[in-house]
Amino acid sequence: MRKIIFLAFLFCAFLQMSNAQSSTEKNKSMPVLRHVVLFKFVDKATPADIKKIEEAFRALPGQINLIKDFEWGVNNSPEKLNDGLTHCFFVTFSSTNDRDTYLVHPAHKAFVEILKPYLEKATVIDYWAHK
C-alpha cells in the first residue's frame, strides 16, 4: 500500500513539473509588443500638473483591457543623457492590433487631451520583445 501511495505521489509530482515546464515554454514562445513612451514637460508644468498626468496614464490599464502589462517611472540616470525626458511609461500588448486599438481608444484620447497643455516633447518607440 505504501508503495502505491509513493508511486501516486511521484506521478502527481511528475505531472506538476511537466505542466509548469509546458507553461514556461508557452510564455517564452509568445512575443509581446512593447510601447515605450517618454515625456518632457514644459517649464510651466507644476508638480501637481505632472502628478495629474501620471495618475491619468496609470489609470489606462483599468480602462483599456487590451493592455497586457504596464510600468512607469521617473528618470534617475546619472548619465544625464535624457535630453529633458523625465517620465517613462512602458505598455505591453499581445498584438499590433491591440496596440492600434489602444491608440484610438476613447480613454487614451482623453489622456492625450490631459497631457497636451503640459507636453514639450514625446518620444515613442514600439518593438517586439526578444528573449
Task: Describe each model-derived feature in a short phrase.
Residues 58-61, 109-112, 119:
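A common structural junction motif
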Residues 34-35, 87, 108, 115:
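Alpha-helical structural signal
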Residues 118-124, 131:
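C-terminal partner/receptor-binding element of secreted or periplasmic proteins
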Residues 46, 104-108, 120:
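Amphipathic alpha-helical protein-protein interaction surfaces
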